[in-house]
From Swiss-Prot:
SUPFAM superfamilies given in the database record: Protein kinase-like (PK-like)
Protein kinase domain sequence ranges: 6-295
UniProt protein name: Cyclin-dependent kinase 4
GO terms of molecular function: ATP binding; cyclin binding; cyclin-dependent protein serine/threonine kinase activity; cyclin-dependent protein serine/threonine kinase regulator activity; protein serine kinase activity
Effect of P173S: No effect on in vitro phosphorylation by CDK7. Greatly reduced T-172 phosphorylation and enzyme activity
Complex and partners: Component of the D-CDK4 complex, composed of CDK4 and some D-type G1 cyclin (CCND1, CCND2 or CCND3). Interacts directly in the complex with CCND1, CCND2 or CCND3. Interacts with SEI1 and ZNF655. Forms a ternary complex, cyclin D-CDK4-CDKN1B, involved in modulating CDK4 enzymatic activity. Interacts directly with CDKN1B (phosphorylated on 'Tyr-88' and 'Tyr-89'); the interaction allows assembly of the cyclin D-CDK4 complex, Thr-172 phosphorylation, nuclear translocation and enhances the cyclin D-CDK4 complex activity.
Gene name of this polypeptide: CDK4
N-acetylalanine PTM positions: A2
Record-listed Phosphothreonine modification sites: T172
Main location as per UniProt: cytoplasm
KW Acetylation (keyword) present: yes
Catalysis: reaction(s): L-seryl-[protein] + ATP = O-phospho-L-seryl-[protein] + ADP + H(+); L-threonyl-[protein] + ATP = O-phospho-L-threonyl-[protein] + ADP + H(+)
Length: 303
């Protein structure tokens, strides 16, 4: 289907995944978000799309059948132009007007009430548990790709795109923030779904602080800021397959969570530390986090 079906309304922003446009579907009157990406022309099956792109898009389309309320919907995929070397593909997503960054900035002082944060976290974790149950690692969770509708529904965006976009990102170097990255990613070790739970922890703290938790300017600086809070991890937890040794960091013990997030109650601080656990094998999962007492205390009407 051609993107000419959609009427462009405004440029939303430029990120690691290229320019995003807000557009209108004249048939339904609904707004959509258009994200274009260049992929190498693979020739052959799939109309020239590389088989990896075909697989990734097929997975995203398969998730659509579940219509999970906390995941942004992929409405359409269109090949819009092609040359011998590359094909431009446009992904058509449902449009949500604000991201979590905007939502947090709009909250009047002293910030979001604890009950609102718990509600956002429950939705966030439900969406992430759904992705992880379908073997999707987001890899780039941050407030800019967690969307919040005007009715307060949280929707995760930009998941499943990392491999689709690998070609374009190699062509267009973009500074990607390190602030939400798990230690195993910063150390360039192997990683899986626990990387997302580290990012969730950083974002959870930010909902209270209204500013990022760890603001490093390099991988080593980011790790140093992490260890300032959680302490230098034991040798047994340090990954074996990395070039940066544990000895590069001075020994230090953990600090109380309340020193950086004073507004957080004790059970919330416990949950945060389970998310910010250095060893990914010991880090809490989205499924287990949803069972945590912090998210069930003072819960409103059952859903």
């Amino acid at each position: 289907m051609a993107t000419s079906r959609y009427e462009p309304v405004a440029e939303i922003g430029v990120g690691a995944y290229g320019t995003v446009y807000k557009a209108r579907d004249p048939h339904s009157g609904h707004f959509v978000a258009l994200k274009s990406v260049r992929v190498p022309n693979g020739g052959g099956g799939g109309g020239g799309l590389p088989i990896s792109t075909v697989r990734e898009v097929a997975l995203l389309r398969r998730l659509e059948a579940f219509e999970h309320p906390n995941v942004v919907r992929l409405m359409d995929v269109c090949a819009t132009s092609r040359t011998d070397r590359e094909i431009k593909v446009t992904l058509v997503f449902e449009h949500v007007d604000q991201d979590l960054r905007t939502y947090l900035d709009k909250a009047p002082p002293p910030g979001l009430p604890a009950e609102t944060i718990k509600d956002l976290m429950r939705q966030f974790l439900r969406g992430l548990d759904f992705l992880h149950a379908n073997c999707i690692v987001h890899r780039d969770l941050k407030p800019e790709n967690i969307l919040v509708t005007s009715g307060g529904t949280v929707k995760l965006a930009d998941f499943g795109l990392a491999r689709i976009y690998s070609y374009q990102m190699a062509l267009t170097p973009v500074v990607v923030t390190l602030w939400y990255r798990a230690p195993e990613v910063l150390l360039q070790s192997t990683y899986a779904t626990p990387v997302d739970m580290w990012s969730v922890g950083c974002i959870f703290a930010e909902m209270f602080r209204r500013k990022p938790l760890f603001c490093g300017n390099s991988e080593a600086d980011q790790l140093g800021k992490i260890f300032d809070l959680i302490g230098l991890p034991p040798e047994d937890d340090w990954p074996r397959d990395v070039s940066l040794p544990r000895g590069a960091f001075p020994p230090r013990g953990p600090r109380p969570v309340q020193s950086v997030v004073p507004e957080m109650e004790e059970s919330g601080a416990q949950l945060l530390l389970e998310m910010l656990t250095f060893n990914p094998h010991k880090r809490i999962s989205a499924f287990r986090a949803l069972q945590h007492s912090y998210l069930h205390k003072d819960e409103g009407n059952p859903e």
